[in-house]
Structures are given as structure tokens and as C-alpha cells.
């Protein structure tokens, strides 16, 4: 995998092209860009046919995580094919990572020589040998070595130091395994930068990885958050400071990745700081868990006075609104369906609801990144940032509370009866 840097602007980030894969030499990705977040190798809620309505080009870059692909190992091994062939995505690049950006890890202490992975069957500790055996079975186009990046702004210095020490140990062993492996000669490595919110530890992590710079096709900035919906509540300014400092130390000729469900405003800040590639977990969480459609504006020439960033499809006010989710949107959902229909699908718990929301949100995100690249090329990203900053956001999503069914009268009466003394119960038994 090769990254070609084409433009570095003064205040808008940089433009480049990611490509040069051994398996797919003609596949490329214009950056800044995103790769598609997947569950078990599939984009959540969308079939390959539905994806054609989002992006006419069937070729793309896929983000795979071992937490929801681990169960495929035995089947892929028996089939003697790559994971790209197994998930019927041979025309797509497969990038394998440790964590799923949409899933928060379960709290717990990590083992000394293993990393906890949170699968659909619960927590499982995976050793370096097990991880590299899995990578050899999958044979992805690119992968990240095993690392400990479970830190956030609340992590102690001791935890950040442990994260760095464990990661350095894992990376050294992975590099040695990779060099000796015949199965991984066509797979690229991506170096994980860890260290929490400690700038000195981040510098040490970058310095350690750059000792083997030739072995890495790019770098992944990790350890900023604990993934999942909580990313929306993180301190964006603190994370941005760490990202900007790390990007200054990384080589310009290598691609920089940073994953998480970041809101669009923070994405723009990270692009300006030098990040090249993101993921679509933000789109998935908005559609599947929050039932919200992305409607933020990225047209800086718009004269509309008020913009909102999201549309809550669960709101009863859309029950008789037969307009599209976003006026002027060219996606399949907005062209064929209305707000009232999507609201109805939510009320009836129809499977089509999240499908239509995912199609709209992904299309909107595709167009958003086109606008980002346009503004980076013209060094006008601050205009887009200011335009987005003036838009109104909905209150943070709160999951609905489970309604308790009313207790039957007979059961309630039993609970209200005074409890008998233990001695009285024994006396009754003796008399009986």
C-alpha cells in the first residue's frame, strides 16, 4: 500500500491518493476520505445491491475488526481463501484492525501477554500468536499489529505508560512474525501510535515506530477514546491537540488514520491537523442506534438562515410530513420516500427503517467528504468549518427507558402482606 501526497496547504490539511495494493493495483482512494465501517465484513444494514445506490463504484476500502470476524477463522481456514473472497468483496480492499469503533470495550484489567477482545460470545483474551495466526488465515490487504489502545482522557499516567510498553512489545513480535511469514508478503502493516493524552508518551511511541518506518505503510492514531457513542461526549479540543502534535512528528509520505464516531466539526479540525483517513462508524451509530438522519449543510454558499445538523425520525411531528429527509438530496431514500414514511417504519419496527437511514447517511457523508477535498484543494477549509459551526445541533441522544409492565393485583397483594416471623412458621409446621 502506497500513499502519494499531492498537496499540502497552509491551513486546510493535505490532499493525497492511497493505493498501490498488491492484490488491487488499480484501486485508489482520494484523501481526505473515509473507509467503510463493517460488521462481520458487511456494511451494517446494507446489501451489495443497496450499496450501488450509495456509491456507483462497487470498489471500496473496508474497515474490518477482529471482534466481529473472529468467528469466521475456522471457516476461512477450511476454505483456503482470503477474507475478501469469503465475504464476497474481492473487488474491495480489506483493512483489519483490533477494535470496532462503534463498540465500547467492557471494563476490565488486561492480561499480561494477551489483549481482551469483546466478541458476540463475550470477552476473550487473544495472545499475539493467536492474533497473527488469524491474520495469516484472513490475509487482509493491510492490518495493524496487536496493540493496547484502551485509554482515554481519564486514564492515569500509569495506565498510559502500560499501554505504550505493551504495544511496543506486541509490535516488535508482530514485525518479526510478519517478516518470516510467507502468507503475509502481500499484506501491509499500519503502525499504532498510543500513549493516551500524555504528549511525552506519544512522542516515545512515534519515535519507536519510526525506527521501523520502512515496515509501515501508514500510521493509526489510537488511544483517544473508548469507542462507541461516548466519543460524541469527549473533549474534542484535548483530542485535537494530541492529534495535531502526533501528525507533526509522523513522516509526510505516510498515510495517517484516525478512527471513531467523531462529529463532522471535529472531523474538519482533524483534517486541518493532517489526518487523511476516517471511518463511517458515526454514520452507523446515527442511523442504527439514534434513528437520526444527517442533514447538516456543507454548502458555504447557502443563504438559508438556520440549519440543523440532524433530523430525529422518531419525532411525532414528521408523521404527516411528506417531504424528503433533506430537500435537494439526491440519495435513494430522499428521492423515493418521505419523512412520514421513515417515521412510520420506526414506529412499526420495520427492518427497512435503518436501511433507508443508512443509505441516506452514507450518501450524505460521501458528499461531505467531496466538499472537504474541494475546500482543501482551494485552501478554504476554515470557511467550511465556520459554516458548520453556526448550525444547530439536536440534544444528545438518550436511549428510551424500558417501560415496566403493571404488576398483577394478586402479586401486588402478596407483596403487601406482612412477612411472618421465622419462629412462628416453625411453630405452625410443628402443630401441623
Curated annotation (Swiss-Prot):
The keyword Cytoplasm applies. One of its GO terms (cellular component) is cytoplasm. The keyword ATP-binding does not apply. Keywords: Cytoplasm, Metal-binding, tRNA processing, Zinc. Gene3D superfamilies: Queuine tRNA-ribosyltransferase-like (3.20.20.105). Residues 422-432 have a biased composition (Basic and acidic residues). It is found in: Cytoplasm. GO terms for biological process: tRNA-guanine transglycosylation. Binds 1 zinc ion per subunit. Residues 390-432 are annotated as: Disordered. Its cofactor is Zn(2+). NCBIfam families: tgt_general (TIGR00449). Belongs to the queuine tRNA-ribosyltransferase family. QTRT2 subfamily. This is Queuine tRNA-ribosyltransferase accessory subunit 2. It comes from Anopheles gambiae (African malaria mosquito). The lineage of its organism: Eukaryota, Metazoa, Ecdysozoa, Arthropoda, Hexapoda.
Amino acid at each position: 500500500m502506497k500513499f502519494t501526497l499531492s498537496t499540502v496547504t497552509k491551513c486546510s490539511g493535505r490532499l493525497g491518493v492511497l493505493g498501490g495494493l498488491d492484490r488491487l493495483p488499480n484501486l485508489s482512494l482520494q484523501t481526505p476520505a473515509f473507509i467503510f465501517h463493517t460488521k462481520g465484513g458487511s456494511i451494517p444494514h446494507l446489501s451489495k445491491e443497496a450499496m450501488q445506490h450509495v456509491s456507483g463504484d462497487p470498489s471500496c476500502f473496508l474497515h474490518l475488526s477482529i471482534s466481529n470476524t473472529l468467528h469466521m477463522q475456522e471457516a476461512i481456514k477450511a476454505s483456503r481463501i482470503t477474507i475478501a473472497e469469503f465475504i464476497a468483496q474481492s473487488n474491495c480492499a480489506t483493512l483489519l484492525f483490533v477494535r470496532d469503533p462503534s463498540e465500547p470495550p467492557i471494563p476490565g484489567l488486561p492480561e499480561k501477554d494477551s489483549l481482551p477482545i469483546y466478541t458476540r460470545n463475550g470477552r476473550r483474551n487473544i495472545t499475539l500468536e493467536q492474533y497473527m495466526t488469524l491474520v495469516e488465515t484472513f490475509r487482509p490487504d493491510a492490518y495493524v499489529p496487536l496493540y493496547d489502545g484502551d485509554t482515554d482522557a481519564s486514564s492515569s499516567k500509569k495506565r498510559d505508560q502500560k499501554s505504550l510498553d505493551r504495544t511496543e512489545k506486541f509490535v516488535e513480535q508482530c514485525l518479526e512474525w510478519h517478516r518470516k511469514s510467507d502468507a503475509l508478503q502481500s499484506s501491509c502493516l499500519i503502525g499504532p501510535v498510543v500513549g493516551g493524552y500524555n504528549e511525552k508518551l506519544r512522542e516515545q511511541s512515534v519515535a519507536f515506530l519510526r525506527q521501523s518506518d520502512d515496515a509501515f505503510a501508514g500510521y493509526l492514531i489510537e488511544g483517544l477514546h473508548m469507542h462507541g457513542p461516548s466519543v460524541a461526549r469527549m473533549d474534542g479540543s484535548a483530542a485535537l491537540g494530541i492529534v495535531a502534535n502526533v501528525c507533526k512528528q509522523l513522516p509526510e509520505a505516510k498515510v495517517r488514520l484516525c478512527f471513531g464516531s467523531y462529529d463532522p466539526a471535529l472531523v474538519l479540525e482533524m483534517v486541518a491537523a493532517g489526518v487523511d483517513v476516517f471511518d463511517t462508524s458515526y454514520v452507523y451509530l446515527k442511523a442504527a442506534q439514534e434513528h437520526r438522519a444527517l442533514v447538516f449543510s456543507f454548502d458555504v454558499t447557502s443563504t438559508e438562515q438556520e440549519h440543523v445538523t440532524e433530523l430525529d425520525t422518531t419525532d411525532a411531528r414528521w408523521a404527516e410530513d411528506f417531504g424528503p429527509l433533506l430537500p435537494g438530496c439526491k440519495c435513494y431514500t430522499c428521492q423515493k420516500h418521505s419523512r412520514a414514511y421513515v417515521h412510520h417504519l420506526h414506529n412499526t419496527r420495520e427492518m427497512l427503517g435503518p436501511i433507508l437511514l443508512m443509505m441516506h447517511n452514507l450518501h450524505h457523508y460521501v458528499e461531505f467528504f467531496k466538499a472537504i477535498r474541494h475546500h482543501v484543494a482551494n485552501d478554504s477549509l476554515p470557511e467550511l468549518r465556520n459554516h458548520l459551526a453556526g448550525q444547530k445541533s439536536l440534544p444528545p441522544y438518550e436511549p428510551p427507558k424500558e417501560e415496566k409492565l403493571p404488576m398483577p393485583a394478586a402479586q401486588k397483594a402478596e407483596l403487601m402482606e406482612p412477612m411472618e416471623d421465622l419462629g412462628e412458621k416453625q411453630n405452625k409446621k410443628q402443630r401441623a
